[in-house]
Structures are given as C-alpha cells and as structure tokens.
C-alpha cells in the first residue's frame, strides 16, 4: 500500500484510525533547521476532532512526539519521526461493518483490492491518516516561510448551496480564517453554513462543499514541464485527501466560459521592484506547470461525509443485500477540518518543488531565497 510522497522532502505516513498510533517519517530535511514543536502542535490542533459541535465528537488531544531526527531543537539531517497516539477509540461501534459495506465509503474497494481490511474506524482510509501529513507539513511551512516568505492560507468557500462572497479579496492570515468555527472569512455566509451543517447533523445526514487556497510570495520557477508540472503534483496531492472529489487551478472550469483575449494574463513590469507581474491571474500563478510569481490559487471540492446515520441499502461480504444503520462518531461536514489539511498538502508539494529547484539551480536559490541565519551557523 503506497504511503509515501515526495522526491527530496519525502513523507511516509503510517497508522490506522483505531490502531495504537499514527504518524510520519520525514526524510530530506536539511540539517540545522530549528524545529518549533509548538508550531507543529498548533497545526495539529486546527485539524483535530472534537474542536466544535460541527465536527465529530471523537475527543483526541493529538499530542505530537518527536522521536528522531531532532537534537537540541534542530534538525540533524536524518529522518524525523513524529508520532501521535490514538486515545479515544470505540471500536465496538464498528462491529456491524466487519461484513457490511458503507455506501460511497472505501470499505468495499479496500476489501476488493486486499481481501482483508481493518473495518474499525475506516482503518487506513480514515482522515486520521492526515495527521502525519499535517505534522510533516508544519516543518515544510516553517522552511518555506523562513527561506522564501511563502504563506499558504485556505478557507471554506462553500457549504452545500451556501457560497461565500469574498470574491478575490483573499484572507491574508489564519487568524482571519479561524475567527469562526466554520473557517469561512465571510462572517455572514459562515453563519448560514453553520446552520446548514447543524441541520444536517440533526437529520443524521451530511453535506459537502469547497475549499479555496492561496499561496502568497511564490517565486517564479517552481515546478517542472510535462510530467512533473506543479499543478499536476498539486492535483495528485489534493485528490489524495479523503472525501476530496474535485480540483481546479485559477479560473478552473469557469475559464472555459471566457475567450482567449479575456482569459490571457498580460505581463507588465512592476514599477519600483522591476518584477515581472501579470495584470490578471486566471492562470492561478501557474503556466506550463511552473510558477510565474503570482499568487497560487486553487480550489478543492469535498463530497458529503459518506458515513451518515440514516438507514441505507447496501450489501454484505456474501454479496447479499441488507440495510445498514451506521454507528460511531463522524463529521456531518468535513470542510472545517479539511482547511488545515489542504494547507498541509499544498505546503508538502511546494517544499519538494523548492528543494528540488534549489538543488538543480543554485543561482535561482541565490536570487530568490532569503538565507536564514541558521544556514550560516552550520560548521562545515
């Protein structure tokens, strides 16, 4: 079962929803980088269950432990292992799923692929797998910010039929996004979204939506042509998140409604800085699979949570039709907790692209990177 991502900044996650623990091993992190454990924990706290009545009531602290690769608060160049223990599992709630498949869940496909599966908590298909990604991405986020000034901010753009009205007035900070439990910076729309989620929760149903994400301060040159395009890597990473069913960059599907003369992003030289900029950003910051220096703008679509508390028709392991009445603790809407997960996988793609570009083109690194003091302190 593939569980790794990245060419240079390589992330390998492990663990199941109701196992002893979940975690990640991160390879390719340069030596000498300060690891701020509180920053990793802060990111995990944004993702953790039980944080509001809009999410699953499973109450996990998701406290992270660093077990290797860090000495006296700094990376030493060896693999970094981060572990989070599972503390609040109720496996008996899943006993009826040992031989019964939840509609639209990975139960059936995992069974068909492997012939055996961990039915409790969804096993490896659970969103708890993303704990490892979020923890690893916290390290990536620190490096990207320190070296390049890159900041990645995601937010809930829609829930069901309720659409936010922020347009292209993108939030500039996580604090702006986290001002409400929905994680939508448009407060009026957030109230409507909250009401819709609670309505679905009361009805034993679920609802989906979209998340938008912007990465600021990307330099031009990240990504590779043809098979390793940055948007291709982003698409693969985003669509690997549980419940994610759609992805677009920049104008995305709405760009098909425009003409070339309307959609093309015209270049100009910015006065004062001499930087090449574009007057519009329909491309979402990517052209030919390579960043052009504008904001990276993406959007992801999430389906309604597949585990609901309504009776559903399904089949069992013998191929017999039956009725499923699901138990357990589940999110009525994954969107509020998916925001930090989206940020995480975007940062994992960006850090890998950055370290690769830095390795193959030292002149690019010298031109665009802000070399932090901790690199200068290395005794070589």
From Swiss-Prot:
Cofactor(s) listed in the protein's UniProt record: FMNH2
Catalytic activity: 5-O-(1-carboxyvinyl)-3-phosphoshikimate = chorismate + phosphate
Comment on bound cofactor: Reduced FMN (FMNH(2)).
EC number: 4.2.3.5
Residues that bind FMN: 124-126, 288, 303-307, 329
Broad EC category: lyase
Any one GO biological process: aromatic amino acid family biosynthetic process
Cited SUPFAM superfamilies: Chorismate synthase, AroC
Binding site for NADP(+): 47
Record flagged with keyword Transferase: no
Alphabetized InterPro entries for the sequence: Chorismate_synth, Chorismate_synth_AroC_sf, Chorismate_synthase_CS
Pathway membership, UniProt: Metabolic intermediate biosynthesis; chorismate biosynthesis; chorismate from D-erythrose 4-phosphate and phosphoenolpyruvate: step 7/7
Disulfide bonds: none
Subunit relationships: Homotetramer.
Name this protein carries in UniProt: Chorismate synthase
């Amino acid at each position: 079962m593939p569980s790794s991502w990245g060419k240079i900044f390589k992330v390998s996650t492990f663990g199941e929803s109701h196992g002893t623990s979940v975690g990640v091993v991160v390879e390719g992190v340069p030596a000498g980088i300060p690891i701020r454990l509180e920053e990793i924990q802060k990111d995990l706290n944004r993702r953790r269950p039980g944080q509001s009545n809009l999410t699953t009531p499973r109450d996990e602290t998701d406290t992270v432990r660093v077990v290797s690769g860090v000495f006296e608060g700094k990376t030493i160049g060896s693999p970094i292992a981060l572990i989070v223990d599972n503390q609040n599992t109720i496996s008996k709630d899943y006993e009826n799923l040992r031989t019964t498949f939840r509609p639209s869940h990975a139960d059936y496909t995992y069974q068909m692929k492997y012939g055996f599966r961990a039915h409790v908590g969804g096993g490896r298909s659970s969103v708890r797998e993303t704990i490892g990604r979020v923890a690893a991405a916290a390290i990536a986020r620190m490096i990207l910010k320190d070296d390049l000034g890159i900041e990645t901010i995601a937010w809930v753009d829609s829930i069901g039929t309720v659409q936010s009205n922020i347009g292209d007035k993108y939030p500039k900070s996580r604090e702006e996004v986290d001002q409400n439990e929905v994680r939508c910076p448009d407060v009026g729309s957030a109230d409507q979204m909250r009401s819709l989620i609670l309505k679905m929760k009361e009805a034993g149903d679920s609802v989906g939506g979209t998340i938008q994400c912007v990465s600021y301060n990307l330099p031009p040159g990240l990504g590779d042509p043809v098979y390793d395009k940055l948007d291709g890597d982003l698409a693969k990473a985003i669509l690997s998140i549980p419940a994610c069913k759609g992805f677009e960059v920049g104008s995305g599907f709405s760009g098909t409604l425009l003409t070339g003369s309307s959609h093309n992003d015209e270049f100009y030289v910015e006065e004062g800085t001499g930087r090449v900029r574009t007057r519009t950003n329909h491309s979402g910051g990517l052209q030919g699979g390579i960043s052009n220096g504008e904001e990276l703008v993406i959007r992801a679509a999430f389906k309604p949570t597949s585990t609901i508390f309504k009776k559903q028709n399904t089949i069992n392991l013998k191929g017999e039709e039956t009725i499923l009445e699901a138990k357990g603790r589940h999110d009525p809407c994954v969107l509020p907790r998916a925001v930090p997960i989206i940020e995480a996988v975007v940062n994992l793609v960006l850090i890998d692209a950055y370290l690769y570009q830095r390795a193959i083109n030292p002149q690019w690194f010298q031109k665009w990177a802000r070399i932090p003091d901790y690199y200068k302190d290395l005794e070589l």
